[in-house]
Amino acid sequence: MGFFKPNIESLEPLPTLDQVRLDAQRTAVIIVDMQNEFADPKGKLYLPSAQQIISSIRSLLSKARRKKVTIVYTMDTHYPGDLEFEDWGQHAVKNSWGWEIVDELKPEHGDIIIEKSRFDAFYNTMLDDILRARKIENLVVVGTVANICVLATISGAYMRGYRVYVPVNAIAYIDEVSLYVALYQATKVYRATLIEKAENVEFE
């Protein structure tokens, strides 16, 4: 059996904006799966990078709340016997500690909660209907994990005609290769715009 090994040094840099200003009334912030299972050291599928991005997401949320931007939390949600457990083990079972949003990013009154059973937050949920009812056009997507639920949700957004913005320092990842691949796919295929830092997203 052979192995494929990418030449990392040959990968092209991805274009990234220093700053972006978005219409607060036409924008939603999508926080993907920032749950104890992934972002707390005691979680079953803990990623150190998920804990490291919490402060950047908090900064983004603070500005978004001041401007009354629509805020959406997605929650990976499973029930006993879910087929996904065959690949990832039992995790994010509804109403368990691991299923809950991390304390540092708890939703507030008026925030939207989307429980999803698969990677894409649009799949078999009311997310698209809710966003269209609010006349949302732009999505700022943050959370975990880059090449799985984040990328799947970006794909779902693109397929439904939304413009997607991705603050690079607010995306959790398994390793730098998977992060690059996810961001490459997001920009080259799904036309997402990368922003260097979540702290540099402004709403007006």
What are these regions (language model features)?
Residues A28-F38:
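Acidic-leg catalytic submotif of subtilisin-like serine proteases
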Residues V32, M75, V168:
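Active-site flanking residues adjacent to catalytic metal/cofactor-binding acidic residues
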Residues I71, D76-G89:
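Early exported N-terminus immediately downstream of N-terminal targeting peptides
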Residues L17, F38-A39:
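Active-site gating/metal-coordination segments in enzymes
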Residues N36, Y79, A172:
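Short, glycine/acidic-enriched loop or turn micro-motifs at the edges of active sites
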Residues M1-A28, S62-R66, Q90-E204:
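Active-site-adjacent betaalpha module
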Residues G2-I8, D40-P48:
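Acidic/histidine-rich helix-loop elements
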